[in-house]
């Protein structure tokens, strides 16, 4: 008899912005699981050079991308940071639907979920030389081609919110103001 239990995965990231590497990882996870919970990490942060986009903006980037890719078996959950690592997994569990497996390469996240007896799987790194949030944000600031590294719906959201102007302004200091 075949099991009817749904296998639901959990993936956490800041998605600043959601890029092609993230999209590829989501698709790979969904080949092994029935659905995925995507935790939008550090949800309380925005308007900094490291976290320029709000949780709501990141939600739009991800949901529009997945809809365009005809992926509908996902949940998006904003997750704020807590200042006590030992409580973080319980915090995630309180916010997210139940899940069976966690996907991460982050050593701290791996440790915290392992201590709570979750199955934790590693993620393959996909085109890491180009597809990192840090490199994409740097390209935005420098006026270089960043669009090729993110899905088209992400480009659209960033343009809608004037995200390039925002991140460029955030990257300046008061000494840069005339």
Curated annotation (Swiss-Prot):
Pfam families: CTP_transf_like. Gene3D superfamilies: HUPs. It is found in: Cytoplasm. SUPFAM superfamilies: Nucleotidylyl transferase. Pathway: Cofactor biosynthesis; NAD(+) biosynthesis; NAD(+) from nicotinamide D-ribonucleotide: step 1/1. It catalyses: beta-nicotinamide D-ribonucleotide + ATP + H(+) = diphosphate + NAD(+). Its EC number is 2.7.7.1. The keyword DNA repair does not apply. Keywords: ATP-binding, Cytoplasm, NAD, Nucleotide-binding, Nucleotidyltransferase, Pyridine nucleotide biosynthesis, Transferase. The keyword Transcription regulation does not apply. InterPro entries: Cyt_trans-like, NMN_Atrans_arc, Rossmann-like_a/b/a_fold. One of its GO terms (molecular function) is ATP binding. It is an enzyme of class 2 (transferase). One of its GO terms (biological process) is NAD biosynthetic process. GO terms for cellular component: cytoplasm. Belongs to the archaeal NMN adenylyltransferase family. NCBIfam families: arch_NMN_Atrans, cyt_tran_rel, PRK01153.1. This is Nicotinamide-nucleotide adenylyltransferase. It comes from Thermoplasma volcanium (strain ATCC 51530 / DSM 4299 / JCM 9571 / NBRC 15438 / GSS1).
């Amino acid at each position: 008899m075949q099991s009817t239990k749904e296998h639901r995965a959990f993936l956490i990231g800041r998605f600043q912005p959601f890029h092609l590497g993230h999209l590829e990882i989501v698709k790979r996870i969904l080949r092994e699981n029935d659905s995925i919970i995507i935790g939008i990490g550090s949800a309380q942060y925005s308007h900094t050079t490291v976290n320029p986009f709000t949780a709501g903006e990141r939600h739009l980037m991800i949901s529009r991308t997945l809809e365009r890719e005809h992926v509908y078996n996902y949940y998006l959950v904003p997750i704020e940071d807590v200042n006590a690592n030992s409580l973080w997994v319980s915090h995630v569990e309180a916010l997210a639907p139940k899940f069976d497996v966690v996907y991460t390469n982050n050593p701290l996240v791996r440790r915290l979920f392992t201590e709570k007896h979750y199955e934790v799987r590693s993620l393959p790194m996909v085109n890491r030389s180009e597809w990192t949030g840090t490199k994409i944000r740097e390209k935005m600031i420098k006026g270089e081609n960043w669009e090729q590294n993110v899905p088209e719906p992400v480009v659209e959201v960033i343009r809608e919110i004037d995200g390039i102007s925002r991140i460029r302004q955030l990257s300046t200091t008061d000494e840069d103001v005339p």
